[in-house]
Amino acid sequence: MNATTINSLFLIGALLVGASILVSSLSSRLGIPILVIILAVGMTAGVDGGGIIFDNYPTAYLVGNLALAVILLDGGLRTRVASFRVALWPALSLATVGVLITTGLTGMAAAWLFDLNLIQGLLIGAIVGSTDAAAVFSLLGGKGLNERVTASLEIESGSNDPMAVFLTVTLIDMLASGHTGLHWSLLTDLIREFGIGAVIGLGGGWLMLQLVNRIHLATGLYPILVVAGGLVVFALTNALHGSGFLAVYLCGLVIGNRPVRSRHGILHMLDGMAWLAQIGMFLVLGLLVTPHDLLPIALPALGLALWMILFARPLSVLVGLAPFKAFHGREKAFISWVGLRGAVPIILAVFPLMAGLPNAQLYFNLAFFIVLISLLVQGTSLPWVAKWLKVTVPPEPAPISRAALEVHVTSEWELFVYRLGAEKWCIGAALRELKMPEGTRIAALFRGQQLLHPSGSTVLEADDLLCVIGHEHNLPALGKLFSQAPERGLDLRFFGDFVLEGDAQLGAVSALYGLKLDGQDADMPLGAFIAQKVGGAPVVGDQVEWNNTIWTVAVMDGNKIGKVGVRFPEGSRPGPGLFL
């Protein structure tokens, strides 16, 4: 490879990445997922478009694995362990039982549609059997979904790859060797993959956390160290025949949920690296496909994609979530619809090509077609379906910007900046009149371009910029004080006519509003009663019916319900009483 060739590669690569970023700005206008646009850029530049011929499957496999490792590390860093209280076991059920059911149903349909034997059909099912972390993390961000749905989908996508990889490799071995029998040793192999991945992931995350917090480096080196450590965990786990995808996700989870030096710098850089990984991966996968090869299989492939979306995935979700009573029917329906396929199926489809199996090109083209349909149909309709199924909650007010204050190694202090909207009640109030959350301080006040020195007598005006020092857990209380809040009508439509304190006694509420206790303990707090009715760990937006009245979880205080919205039947709305 001479200098001219290398220069041409740099030029073409930079132009493709730049074009992907620029064209992605059309995503929100067209309502098309960014990942589809990036895939389209790669396909347009490929053999049937710009004429770039790329058929190096090992390179695509390398790029895909590297990109997925970075994306999963970033996803783990941003996942809160608190979300595990509502979604860990349901997500693991979807990641194991759900993948098995999807693989079986999709495989049988594929065998019938494409005149393959059962093992070949099941291989197709295994290749497309898992949801994709890159697609899920990318498309769920900022959609305002309730915590149970979001956490279930994110944890599932971060943990279901081991099952899909295991099934794919096992079925490839069967086809290559001609042995089609199943042995109990396969189950032990699967448990080993999960076990090695979990142990190395958790252990590697803890070691990286200690290393980052104990050594002194230039600020910009900490994110690189975390990425390098994540890749070591990924590669070492794979070398020991464990699940590298699970390991790197858990590694990020450990680091992201403990005090860590340069936390915001790490997250900021990982965000950019994860985007670059997604762009590079989907560009390469777009270049790898030959669009005209998809046309002969388009109709049966479309039928298989619709079978998986409309039957296999919903049935796997119904079975996988059957033991978990907290999930409402509309939540199960939404989780069924968001069985997003992305890069993982295409990367798994490279395995048969590298193994030299018959029909390997068919497997690859099918996987690509199904991913394209999944992103176009499910990804594009996701916001509409979320609103239709009522799994969204009113957005929490947030600061316009936030920055870390590195006052010591594991400092969790942050600086939050709020712009005061004209409708906020605090406009015209003196600072001494504000009920600030404990442990927070107002650091500065900007009016126009002027920096003011705030004092207790300073009166707030519309469009003031207020800088507040606090912790992440102070954000809900600060948001109510200073942020541009959603319209009150939105809260009333969602939470009900009034909002009641969660520690109000059930007997007092029943007596004041003429409700029947039906044998319930009168001294039980309303929040505990609603949690009992939910049947699992409650989240904001959970609704139950009691005494012909709709009760909605409005605020969570840790693991307890802090406030409950209540909607009375039409024409029977009482006065506010205990309601706040």
UniProtKB/Swiss-Prot annotation:
It catalyses: K(+)(in) + H(+)(out) = K(+)(out) + H(+)(in). One of its GO terms (cellular component) is plasma membrane. Gene3D superfamilies: 1.20.1530.20, 3.30.465.10, Regulator of K+ conductance, C-terminal domain (3.30.70.1450). It is a multi-pass membrane protein. The keyword Magnesium does not apply. It is found in: Cell inner membrane. Keywords: Antiport, Cell inner membrane, Cell membrane, Ion transport, Membrane, Potassium, Potassium transport, Transmembrane, Transmembrane helix, Transport. One of its GO terms (biological process) is cell volume homeostasis. GO terms for molecular function: flavin adenine dinucleotide binding; potassium:proton antiporter activity. Signal peptide: none annotated. SMART domains: CorC_HlyC. Residues 402-484 form the RCK C-terminal domain. Pfam families: CorC_HlyC, Na_H_Exchanger, TrkA_C. The keyword Transport applies. The chain crosses the membrane at residues 6-26, 34-54, 57-77, 94-114, 121-141, 162-182, 193-213, 217-237, 240-260, 269-289, 292-312, 334-354, 366-386. NCBIfam families: PRK05326.1-1, PRK05326.1-2, PRK05326.1-3. HAMAP family: NhaP2. PANTHER family: K(+)_H(+) ANTIPORTER NHAP2, NA(+)/H(+) ANTIPORTER 1. Belongs to the monovalent cation:proton antiporter 1 (CPA1) transporter (TC 2.A.36) family. NhaP2 subfamily. K(+)/H(+) antiporter that extrudes potassium in exchange for external protons and maintains the internal concentration of potassium under toxic levels. This is K(+)/H(+) antiporter NhaP2. It comes from Pseudomonas fluorescens (strain ATCC BAA-477 / NRRL B-23932 / Pf-5).
